[in-house]
């Protein structure tokens, strides 16, 4: 796989912005590339905004994709813990290209109207059951990749979301057991073509959500034991530096456990599957007048404890 020049550029831009580096002993798993390495590798981000420890250099027997890593469960996680505790060389952030923490999952599950304040924004009742839709895995790109405006849509919108990554296979999972199936959390940008989603040809939710580049993820998969409370995290989105969404995951109608229990009635979850848990208020379509993304815009999606992803619109 060739290293994308666009990814290198945006990673360098992130470094140049001097986001505050927050060193930690939290487990922040990443997929990355570097000019001196062949293909994608697994690593550990050394804190929010830090460099990367090459896990495959620490243990060459480890798989090089996150899905395979998660499939091996505790065996691979224990290796990552040893690597985190060791004094290992760190690749500078400016020398690596961050990929999405999960690529080509079996499924990407999405939830509509899952924030109380987002329901209030639209003056609609809070749903009594989760409203589920999906995005194709081909829409996933890295945390600093570009979002490409498709010629088929004139109304492309932003949505910051908390994403859950599944770590253990399961079906008919009880809510009380659901967190045992979670590997961790990451930041998602659920880019949405509102004209297709809301009007075109009977309201095409799938098509409106699943154009190429419409699902940036990252920067890291933060393991569940590294997140104090996934349902009490500040969540925000900025477009060209302007704060457009600002809320807290405590506004979620259906929490992670409820969503896993509900969806697993219908489908089997596999390691690497991603659940986008809904967006808070402040999206462009409900502004007066509506505002949509245009070429040259820059969208920053941020969640407390998880990090920031930055996507330029082209």
Swiss-Prot record:
Signal sequence range: none
Gene3D superfamilies per UniProt: Fumarylacetoacetase-like, C-terminal domain (3.90.850.10)
Enzyme class: hydrolase
MF GO annotations: hydrolase activity; metal ion binding
InterPro entries in UniProt: FAH, Fumarylacetoacetase-like_C, Fumarylacetoacetase_C_sf
The enzyme's E.C. designation: 3.-.-.-
Sites bearing N6-acetyllysine, chain numbering: 203, 234
Function, as annotated: May have hydrolase activity.
Family of the protein in this entry: Belongs to the FAH family.
Protein name according to UniProt: Fumarylacetoacetate hydrolase domain-containing protein 2
Organism: Pongo abelii
